[in-house]
Amino acid sequence: MGADGETVVLKNMLIGINLILLGSMIKPSECQLEVTTERVQRQSVEEEGGIANYNTSSKEQPVVFNHVYNINVPLDNLCSSGLEASAEQEVSAEDETLAEYMGQTSDHESQVTFTHRINFPKKACPCASSAQVLQELLSRIEMLEREVSVLRDQCNANCCQESAATGQLDYIPHCSGHGNFSFESCGCICNEGWFGKNCSEPYCPLGCSSRGVCVDGQCICDSEYSGDDCSELRCPTDCSSRGLCVDGECVCEEPYTGEDCRELRCPGDCSGKGRCANGTCLCEEGYVGEDCGQRQCLNACSGRGQCEEGLCVCEEGYQGPDCSAVAPPEDLRVAGISDRSIELEWDGPMAVTEYVISYQPTALGGLQLQQRVPGDWSGVTITELEPGLTYNISVYAVISNILSLPITAKVATHLSTPQGLQFKTITETTVEVQWEPFSFSFDGWEISFIPKNNEGGVIAQVPSDVTSFNQTGLKPGEEYIVNVVALKEQARSPPTSASVSTVIDGPTQILVRDVSDTVAFVEWIPPRAKVDFILLKYGLVGGEGGRTTFRLQPPLSQYSVQALRPGSRYEVSVSAVRGTNESDSATTQFTTEIDAPKNLRVGSRTATSLDLEWDNSEAEVQEYKVVYSTLAGEQYHEVLVPRGIGPTTRATLTDLVPGTEYGVGISAVMNSQQSVPATMNARTELDSPRDLMVTASSETSISLIWTKASGPIDHYRITFTPSSGIASEVTVPKDRTSYTLTDLEPGAEYIISVTAERGRQQSLESTVDAFTGFRPISHLHFSHVTSSSVNITWSDPSPPADRLILNYSPRDEEEEMMEVSLDATKRHAVLMGLQPATEYIVNLVAVHGTVTSEPIVGSITTGIDPPKDITISNVTKDSVMVSWSPPVASFDYYRVSYRPTQVGRLDSSVVPNTVTEFTITRLNPATEYEISLNSVRGREESERICTLVHTAMDNPVDLIATNITPTEALLQWKAPVGEVENYVIVLTHFAVAGETILVDGVSEEFRLVDLLPSTHYTATMYATNGPLTSGTISTNFSTLLDPPANLTASEVTRQSALISWQPPRAEIENYVLTYKSTDGSRKELIVDAEDTWIRLEGLLENTDYTVLLQAAQDTTWSSITSTAFTTGGRVFPHPQDCAQHLMNGDTLSGVYPIFLNGELSQKLQVYCDMTTDGGGWIVFQRRQNGQTDFFRKWADYRVGFGNVEDEFWLGLDNIHRITSQGRYELRVDMRDGQEAAFASYDRFSVEDSRNLYKLRIGSYNGTAGDSLSYHQGRPFSTEDRDNDVAVTNCAMSYKGAWWYKNCHRTNLNGKYGESRHSQGINWYHWKGHEFSIPFVEMKMRPYNHRLMAGRKRQSLQF
């Protein structure tokens, strides 16, 4: 059996048990007890007139058992009146028919609830022993309920499932809800007050207690009684509806009293300090209050405060014993001071109507001025003040036109910042600065020059009428911060500052000393400024050959200039360089000395002459000065020799002393200059004994005589050789000039030679043939044979001849014999001008008187001639080419010999006779060689011709450029084998003349600086060592493209930033600018080459950005330069007007979105004027060209029309929504050409459409006159909505739409350009009604915009 079945069984059981118990307990003869049991479900549907007796329960719904007990008293056993009184005391006066007693028992686990209601009829006597019987009944019912509860628990435990009750339950009538159905009588037993079959007819309660008449169940009571059953006594006038009637007496409500509650009661019975009059206390003197319980305050606190204990507690904004005085502002403080304004702040109550600010200079005769601000302001900025003045400032609070006592302060404005600072003249040690004068009085100026490193500085003060100053004594090349400050008493203005750098000073007192032919030593005093390098330039005066430039590192103050051209005029200058700045140069000129002749040598020598030859000086000298003397210095001789045409010059010194060593010095002479001499020592040959003659001869002796040798000698040596061939010698003292040879062979021919000797030096011999006895000239002797001359000697004839005849001719040309007549004393002759390699026939004839002897004949062949015109070319480090002209005579080959002039072996090479040039190889670099050349035929060799040559230096190798940047490159090379004094680097680019750089010989690298970016360079290099230079090597390189410089971000706002840079030095095509944010977004822009800035727009707020910039040229890109910045955030994320846009940093006028009430869903595009009178204006109307028709209907004016960037009307709905956000002010700007006017109103609003968009404006200010106040409070009118008060339709009449009244003083939406009366765009107080204003703008902004903007600026400053 289910739960529903269990519930039905329980219900039936309980009903049955209740009926049985109640029936068995109540006696019918006494009171009748009716018990009704009703089971209902909670939350069941209520029926009209009562509750249904039975409803079928569902499984989930709780079950409620209602037990109703009606105790009826038979009519024939009505109780007496005494009983009735007793009964009335037991029942409540509120009960109508029955006294009810209710009880309830619940079982929450099974959701079964038992309720019991026992009804006793009113005014009935109690049943006999009713209290005891009822108590017993209740006890048994409780026992029954407990048993049923136990039974339910058992059934819930499935103990009754087999015997659960089943069957159909009948419907029990509900007796109209005013009775219970009785099973005994099978009918309704009605409740008290009801009767009828279904208990549906009412009885009057208690029969109206016999104090009234029952009409349709309702009692109509007698006049003294009341109540539903007329059982209550009536109170007088029903307590006047101000109290409760209890047993006929009024219990009055507060604050009423009296029998009928008509009188008012006084509070606290007036505290004994007054009397009550109709509820109001009339207090005694000195007391006040509703209950007269308070002490009276002075003047009743003037109605501006509360009286507490006799003292006034004033309302906000008032003070004083009787609250009659306005409280002054508190805590007056200076928030900011400038030269022409003072910003004040104070604390004040909200009740203040306005504040009056009074200010006056403390100086005698100062004008007192006032300024008024609204009472909700807590600060003000006083403007248009005089700089450097002290002002007495008083601030008054005003309430209802009553001024408070002032709060005061004494504040001095700052001196104005000097303006127009500029520099007129800048030198190494002076700077002339000037600035603009002030228009007000002050004491003077202070000018300071402070070095950037803050070390030292100078300060000067000048009178106030001076506006320029020349500061001297500054350091050259120093950067100074220049400050100009105005002074007045103890006050100082803010400085105006600028930086200036003095010109770097150059080197001074340049001096050239120790000038030689190729070297000069340059000295200077270095500059005082810090410089990057010293630039030394020198070159020939006149510009020939260009200028050589050296970069020298400071603090170098001297330099040796080398490789100069001898005897030349040079100009040298030195200057200092720092960055791109070059100082003035110090310049001087000098002339190099003439170089001495080189390679001085003796070509040939005799006893009385020396043939000298030397290499010409490099200088263009005119002549040479030859000075010579014996080593003893007895006498100096001087001779001037013109410069030879060729590479050498020759000179012959004659009349010398034979056998004497001479010191020779040769100096080059040019104009008045003379070089140092080239010197050498040379010795003349010993003088031969001359005029050797045979004075006598015998069979065994020969007597000789000669002329004494003129030079110093030790002795003479006589050699005599007979024809037999055995030579003999004899030494003769030097003072002898004759000698007789004895013990000779008789009849023999002797060859006798006499030589002078000194030490190991021997003179040429003097030879003579002699005969012992009579002997003729026997034969000729040939010596000193050359290619063009020969020396011939012979013996003396015996006896001596009168004269001698010498004949000679080539063998093949004997018919052309040449004859030479000789003195008889001659014993030798020299034949000159002979042909080389030619056999000559020579005969000698002695003439004795008229007798001619037989000729003595001999032959001699001249030597072969040497090659001519030897030259050197193609000199390299290890080879030279020798060239020459061939000799005349035939020969077999050439022999080329060469050896170092210092120490080294002699090498030779054989060259065929068919060539005239030969390359000598395998030489040492940078070495001087002596090269000789002669021709060879058989065993015969010609004379040698010689020359000197220096082999070239070895080249440096592997020249490369590395570490290349836009302005620098590192040159590296490998040194040559030989010693290097210096390297010379010539740097060229394009067609520009090269720059020469000198590098020390020990270096193998050099850094080039200050190069031009993106430029192709050629670096050529060679080594030098003294006069020698190596071959050149070169390399090419290109500098990189230099990047833009000084990349900066400025004017950073929430969504934009200005990016600027300095362009690279190189020519470029464009820039590539990339910017990226921290969220990973990236954007690349191509920027024209001529641009140096770009404004980035549309950036994200509060975002870090990195900007990368490169320059580009063709396919070449520079390195990247970068910067970073962070965009700002919005003060107002969703601006609701243009003022908030302005405070967000949007300073450009234009179209912006606003969000009404800050809601994103109420977005509106408006035009913002960010410049007029502090900006922040929403423009809602503009007329400027007549292109837009303003004669429109209501619907257009409601939603708006036109272009917000041209002519437009924003719309009445939009204007209303904007002005509903807070207090706004209105400004109307009007222009006619150059003439302008405006009108402003400190309040502006437009009501909604239900109020026809009525206009509300405040107080006027401006220059146009107040023409709009006439329209105050007027609704808007269009041609189809006439809301004006005029007889006609103003909008129709004047072709516009406006807040017309009758009709207008201003008509800003009238017809454009219409000048007829009142038809155009009018503003009466400016241009009248017969002028149409060409330009009009209507705009609004929050009333407190100035204050908010000022506070925002202040917060940004702090």
Curated annotation (Swiss-Prot):
Which cysteines share a disulfide bond? C292-C301, C297-C312, C314-C323
Q: Which residues are glycosylated?
A: 36-37, 55, 176, 180, 198, 271, 278, 302, 392, 470, 581, 791, 874, 1036, 1046, 1261
**Domain Fibrinogen C-terminal span(s) in chain numbering:** 1129-1344
Where does the record place the modification Phosphoserine? S724
What is one GO biological process annotated to this record?
Answer: positive regulation of transmission of nerve impulse
* The keyword Secreted appears for this protein: yes
GO cellular component labels: cell surface; collagen-containing extracellular matrix; extracellular region; extracellular space; glutamatergic synapse; membrane raft; perineuronal net; Schaffer collateral - CA1 synapse
Tissues in which the UniProt entry reports expression? Brain specific.
Coiled coil (UniProt feature): 127-157
- Coarsely, its chief localization is secreted
The UniProt entry, under Pfam families, shows: EGF_TEN, EGF_Teneurin, Fibrinogen_C, fn3
The EGF-like domain, residue ranges = 188-199, 219-230, 250-261, 281-292, 312-323
Q: What is the disorder linked to it?
A: Neurodevelopmental disorder, non-progressive, with spasticity and transient opisthotonus: An autosomal recessive disorder characterized by delayed motor milestones, delayed walking, speech delay, axial hypotonia, and peripheral spasticity apparent from infancy or early childhood. Affected individuals often show transient opisthotonic posturing in infancy, and later show abnormal involuntary movements. Variably impaired intellectual development, and brain myelination defects are present in some patients.
What's this protein's name?
A: Tenascin-R
Q: Taxonomic classification, please?
A: Eukaryota, Metazoa, Chordata, Craniata, Vertebrata
Q: What is this protein's gene name?
A: TNR
